[in-house]
């Protein structure tokens, strides 16, 4: 069975709207009812179970905010990553800088839930943060100080295939298992920090050294503006 509702934007034909019922291309029945009545009937068909508790899946421990769109099955996860040291490959798979100082990061992951227990990463945005205080809507956001990230914070992944995970909990370590496993190039390395170093010299300088917070450049956005 197929149900189709027809109405006109002509105010004089407002009450001439109708609901048709078709079966295999053959019209079986037709009802005339106003658009207001149709909306009321449609709204009443969505019953809310007040006794049902809706639970989120288990979430990453570094998650500070998330949104979920049930129509598109899209998840946006915002993870707060404390400053750490990481090996970084630059320009090719053979050139590796050891234990490079990475500042505190704010990473926004966007996942599409393709089916139960399957989440495809579609985009990620990376920003830097200062200090160790808790994040609030007024927290100032800074640019990711390395390369491969454009002016709005979106990471360019190039030919790297975006990962699929089986549980949102796995996003907790995606910065280690995916982001810093990619090869960094000079792409978008322009006004990313206030040092005068080229990317290779910067990575060399930061080996086994914490990233200097005073080198960060403001993104001209607050956390509250990012999550709007």
Predicted features and spans:
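Compact alpha/beta protein-protein interaction domains typified by the UBC
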Residues: 2-163
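Domain-scale recognition of soluble eukaryotic interaction modules
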Residues: 2-4, 10, 136-228
